[in-house]
Swiss-Prot record:
The gene is OPG114. This is Core protein D2. Belongs to the orthopoxvirus OPG114 family. Transmembrane segments: none annotated. GO terms for cellular component: virion component. Induction: Expressed in the late phase of the viral replicative cycle. Late protein which is part of a large complex required for early virion morphogenesis. This complex participates in the formation of virosomes and the incorporation of virosomal contents into nascent immature virions. The keyword Aminoacyl-tRNA synthetase does not apply.
Length: 146
């Protein structure tokens, strides 16, 4: 009896950012999650923070700077040039992001950027938290069942 193991296939599988059930369970136990999305809205990375994003200590702006770090047009639209990014405590890849983002500019671009930002804040638990953290379950179920 011989077992054929194709190391290349296994490596490609692991590098393709497959979301395992343990990752899903971990996300559903996290309190403060920020989702990075493709241009079509599909979540690509879940960034986990141990502290809540707040306006009074400006951590919400620092998280936004991290979230849009690779999109200078959005950083400029949201006036985040002088803000230091706040790195997450952990990030979990959900899917591969190989799409180009459209260049955002003007009032419409600002509205799209803000919409994307405010839809990024999620929570995996049902404790009382600020209104801008939406339930995560819907997004994760969509990814796992695809």
């Amino acid at each position: 009896m011989s077992i054929n193991i194709d190391i290349k296939k296994i490596t490609d599988l692991l590098n393709s950012s497959i979301l395992f059930p343990d990752d899903v369970q971990e996300l559903l136990r996290e309190k403060y999650i920020v989702l990075e999305r493709k241009s079509n809205g599909t979540p690509t990375v879940a960034h986990i923070y141990k502290t809540m994003a707040r306006f009074d200590n400006k951590s919400i702006y620092r998280i936004a700077k991290f979230l849009f770090m690779n999109r200078p047009d959005v950083i400029k639209l949201l006036f985040l040039e002088d803000v230091e990014p706040l790195l997450p405590d952990k990030s979990i890849n959900i899917s591969i992001n190989n799409t180009e983002y459209p260049q955002l500019e003007g009032p419409i671009g600002t509205k799209i950027a803000l919409l994307e930002l405010f839809n990024a804040f999620r929570t995996g638990i049902s404790e009382p938290i600020p209104y801008y953290y939406l339930p995560l379950r819907k997004d994760i179920n969509n990814i796992v069942t695809k």
